[in-house]
């Protein structure tokens, strides 16, 4: 399997994934693998604060999450309407009580709740919003190369999204071939291919496609807790931000 980490962990819990401790896992950064060998990350998305530089000044760039509560941002921000992993990460970084309080206050800032990171990045580049708290770094840099008035900054530590991950299927028809494939994807050579596709590799010895992002301090998420409490995170996010995130 190569799928979203959250989906892979559900398959693991259902007994559909078996451990495989690939020798290449050694090079994978700790936040992107489990100790038992059920999964390892192929690539991850790093979400940061993104601003439109025509609508803001460098001094306006938020340095703390609470800076988003400044009245100057009211009605000028957009948030993806299924940002459950981001919502969960705030609770692990800040603590549940502080994060819930922050989220409720943020919701009063008249956010534009939109569907899709690509759409939000386009709105940001076009100046329809001044800021988004979850702009993906690779999208931001692509926009900058094209001349869009976009800049980003990280509020550290940054919790990477659940990585797109791979694991060995319990009933794989050719398990040895699957193991060799896993070895390649997690190897330095395989992760270099990932980098060339403008994705963030999970190995520590492969430079990120955006060198500046390599210096960002990462937060080690406890994703098992997110998976087990996902329904609660969805409900709380929906209640606070007034959307139907995660409902399928």
Task: Walk through the language-model features, giving the residues of each.
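An extracytoplasmic/periplasmic, membrane-proximal ligand-sensing/linker region
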Residues: 97-99, 202-248
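Flexible hinge/capping segments at coil-to-helix
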Residues: 58-72
């Amino acid at each position: 399997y190569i799928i979203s980490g959250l989906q892979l962990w559900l398959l693991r819990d259902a007994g559909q994934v078996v451990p495989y401790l690939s020798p290449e896992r050694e090079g994978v950064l700790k936040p992107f693998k489990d100790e038992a060998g059920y999964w390892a990350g192929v690539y991850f998305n790093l979400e940061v604060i993104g601003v439109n530089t025509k609508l803001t000044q460098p001094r306006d760039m938020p340095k703390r999450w609470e800076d988003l509560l400044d009245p100057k941002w009211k009605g000028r921000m957009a948030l993806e309407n299924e940002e459950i992993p981001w919502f969960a990460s705030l609770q692990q970084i800040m603590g549940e009580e502080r994060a819930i309080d922050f989220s409720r206050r943020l919701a009063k800032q008249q956010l534009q709740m939109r569907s899709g990171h690509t759409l939000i990045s386009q709105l940001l580049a076009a100046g329809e919003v001044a800021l988004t708290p979850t702009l993906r770094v690779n999208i931001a840099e692509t926009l900058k190369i094209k001349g869009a008035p976009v800049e980003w900054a990280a509020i550290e530590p940054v919790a990477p999204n659940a990585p797109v991950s791979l694991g060995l299927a319990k009933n794989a028809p050719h398990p040895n071939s699957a193991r060799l494939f896993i070895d390649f994807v997690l190897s330095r050579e395989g992760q270099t291919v990932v980098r060339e596709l403008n994705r963030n590799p999970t190995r520590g010895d492969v430079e990120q496609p955006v060198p500046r992002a390599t210096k960002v301090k990462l937060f080690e998420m406890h994703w098992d807790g997110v998976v087990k409490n996902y329904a609660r995170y969805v409900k709380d996010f929906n209640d606070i931000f007034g959307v139907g995130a995660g409902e399928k």
